[in-house]
């Protein structure tokens, strides 16, 4: 592993603070996220400096990261989550998440909050700590750890009326990989009629292909729902050309109106984000 890595934590911290001030409806979740960030940053640095062996990762994280995650959650999280994490079989949750097992929301939150920064620090070696045989269609999974996609990201193209190429962000190790804009990232569906895109406006979500009052600016000009009626899955899609300051994994946490609208349409994400949405 290279000893040099660009730390993502300052940008995440700054963006979370900005979005918390801008979107009060996401304040509780972003407050918890801001309290978690120092814990995750410390885990990232320690894993970069002395990477744990893959077979030792659950025990390493349970001893050295998990207690601080629980402390931060009890201090700043919603009461129901704080109570739930106290009763979790934490190391079992960590093992299960690395294996791709279905976990209840509190276990999944603890595992992601604890292991996410460590796997991100391990980079290409993260896959050796994970079950890489997950899912029937391997082409839709992370090439590093075979985790599920969390976000769709459109790169800035340099042109005001066009977006750049698309990549997906892994929910497990934070790696990214290329994906065609004309397919569903969850199931590979390519028929245009089965793929839907919705953007958020002050008066409610509308089709990105038309509709709305045309007078009020979007609440999330750089975010939209990319959904599929074949598998009933969706991802939040971040257009970096519309907001170069966006930090995709942070901006997704503030996109609650989009998630609620998608749920009303019968859509679910391949996997919930860190905060369960």
Positions of predicted regions on the chain:
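N-terminal alpha-helical interaction blocks
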Residues: 1-132
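C-terminal membrane-proximal segments flanking the terminal transmembrane helix
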Residues: 258-274
């Amino acid at each position: 592993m290279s000893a040099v890595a660009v730390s993502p934590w300052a940008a995440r911290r700054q963006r979370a603070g900005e979005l918390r001030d801008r979107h009060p409806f996401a304040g509780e979740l972003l407050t918890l996220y801001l309290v978690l960030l120092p814990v995750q940053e410390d885990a990232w640095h320690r894993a970069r400096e002395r990477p744990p062996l893959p077979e030792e990762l659950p025990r390493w994280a349970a001893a050295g990261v998990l207690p601080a995650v629980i402390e931060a959650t009890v201090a700043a999280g919603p009461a129901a989550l704080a109570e739930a994490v106290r009763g979790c079989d934490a190391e079992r949750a960590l093992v299960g998440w690395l294996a791709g097992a279905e976990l209840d929301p509190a276990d999944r939150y603890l595992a992601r909050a604890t292991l996410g920064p460590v796997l991100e620090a391990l980079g290409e070696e993260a896959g050796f700590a994970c079950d890489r045989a997950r899912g029937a269609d391997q082409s839709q999974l992370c090439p590093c750890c075979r985790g599920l996609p969390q976000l769709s990201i459109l790169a800035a193209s340099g042109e005001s009326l066009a977006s750049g190429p698309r990549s997906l962000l892994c929910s497990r190790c934070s790696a990214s990989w290329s994906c065609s804009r004309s397919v569903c990232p969850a199931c590979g569906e390519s028929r245009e009629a089965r793929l839907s895109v919705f953007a958020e406006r002050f008066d409610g979500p509308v089709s990105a292909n038309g509709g709305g009052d045309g007078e009020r600016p979007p609440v999330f000009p750089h975010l939209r729902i990319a959904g599929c009626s074949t598998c009933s899955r969706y991802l939040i899609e971040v257009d970096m050309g519309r907001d170069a300051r966006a930090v995709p994994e942070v901006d997704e946490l503030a996109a609650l109106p989009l998630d609620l609208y998608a749920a009303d349409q019968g859509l679910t994400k391949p996997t919930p984000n860190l905060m369960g949405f």
